[in-house]
Amino acid sequence: MSFAENVGRFIGNSVNSVGSVIGDGLKGFNSTQSISSAKQANLLNNLPLPSLDNVLNIGMFGGLASGLLSYRAAKKQNKVMQDIANRQMAFQERMSSTAVRRHVEDLKKAGLNPLLALGGSASTPQGAFYSPVNPMESGLNSAISVADKVFDYQRLAHADFQGRLNSAMSVVQLASAVQDYKRNYGKFGEVAYWFDRYAGKLLPAMLFYLFRKHPVGRAVSAANSGYAVAKGAKGVNFKFSNMSSTAVQRHNSRYNVSKGWRR
């Protein structure tokens, strides 16, 4: 059997062995991935999703209750602040209207002449005020909060639906790709698909490694190394011979029979 036939037989056996190992591994990986994808799809489909009506009812009643309580609290706060301001203004009015009389009484009690109070006059109080609170503001904020919750739920529902759709599309595309390979390349299409996707770049390196470990591969490597050394030695010899012939030519060109050596 020739050297080429040995190399071809070795490569063929290596490819068959590596292909069978990779094919079995990828088939198992494919089965595991299919089972995992199916479980994930079932889990996604069985996830409890609250209904929109329940969310709307909870958000609406909660918002209405919060708005009503805030409205009543604001009205009560306005009433309390108004009562405080009214009592303060009543006190200021009473003090201002009795200022001269109280001054005279104080002078009498002090043993002084009450006529000293004639130069005084009643004061003008500044009054009292409060900052009222708009009771409708709390109700409006509660209504806006309810609307925001509805929109947030719609966004979450859309994102969940999009995620389910993407998962389903990934499974469908994967199954379609495998079926296309099966249909186009026969019973080895599935293995070819996974091999092309995951192991296509590993096979050349594996084959080269196995070839280098085989006796034939070691012989080929040694032959290549010897050829490289011989080629390098031949190049050096050729260069030396060229240098020798050039030196002889220069020597002959400088000598003349009739005139002798030229300087």
UniProtKB/Swiss-Prot annotation:
<keyword id="KW-1162">Viral penetration into host cytoplasm</keyword>
<comment type="similarity">
    <text>Belongs to the microviridae H protein family.</text>
</comment>
<keyword id="KW-0167">Capsid protein</keyword>
<comment type="function">
    <text>Probably triggers with protein G the injection of the phage DNA into the host upon conformational changes induced by virus-host receptor interaction.</text>
</comment>
<keyword id="KW-1171">Viral genome ejection through host cell envelope</keyword>
<protein>
    <recommendedName>
        <fullName>Minor spike protein H</fullName>
    </recommendedName>
</protein>
<keyword id="KW-0946">Virion</keyword>
<dbReference type="GO" id="GO:0046718">
    <property type="term" value="P:symbiont entry into host cell"/>
</dbReference>
<dbReference type="GO" id="GO:0019028">
    <property type="term" value="C:viral capsid"/>
</dbReference>
<keyword id="KW-0945">Host-virus interaction</keyword>
<keyword id="KW-1160">Virus entry into host cell</keyword>
